[in-house]
Amino acid sequence: AGVSRATVSRFLNNGYVSEEKRQRIKKVIDETGYRPSAQAQTLRTKKTNLVGVIIPKINSDSIGRMVAGISLVLSQAGYQLLLANTDNNEKEEIKYLKVLAEKQVDGIILIGTVITGAHKKLLAALSIPAVILSQRLSGYSCVYYDDFQAARELTALLLETGTNVAYIGVTDRDEAAGRQRREGFLMAFEDCGKTAREELF
């Protein structure tokens, strides 16, 4: 390409290189099929361009849509996605948090089942950014919807229209969403001075 090694290095690491030299380097790379070593780049830049995504189940439509959106955004930003499926197993979530940290990914997105003390301890020890989806955890970047308020408003709407209301769904053991939904359901009854009968559950 007729340029110095330092110029090639800057090109490979997205540093400043004039457009004319950039085109010459790119032409030689395309002709030779050269691919820089990912390990060498990681050592040099301290970045892997990998983001780990831990999911509770792979066969969920809503999780699938989340992962598709995450994948699109990461790809547009030059990152690759590493996917870890836990089958709703808290121990597997902990294991994958450790594995991804050891792989030195640039970040972790956790779509967890239940955030336990072990999760909190491990998340606090991470030296990489972590984002938690579908749950609220104080002190962390979280993206979630308000299950409590959604259940409350839906139940209130049904009560106002005189529709027979029954609570269908999840149990108290489902801390990620179930408990909040149940509390929202009960609060809607309380708001209108009614009592939710036991057989509704």
What do the PLM-derived regions correspond to, one by one?
Residues 1-48:
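N-terminal helix-turn-helix DNA-binding module of bacterial transcription factors
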Residues 5-10, 43-59, 157, 164-171:
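Short beta-strand segments enriched in small/hydrophobic residues
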Residues 30-68, 76-79, 87-89, 99-102:
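N-terminal helix-turn-helix/winged-helix DNA-binding helices
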Residues 31, 72-77, 125-132, 136-201:
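Bacterial carbohydrate/catabolite-sensing allosteric modules
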Residues 56, 86, 113, 135, ...:
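Cofactor-binding loop segments of dinucleotide-utilizing enzymes, especially the Rossmann-like FAD-
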Residues 63, 93, 151:
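Aromatic/hydrophobic pocket-lining residues that form the small-molecule binding cavity
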Residues 72-117, 121:
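Central regulatory/effector-binding core of bacterial HTH transcription factors
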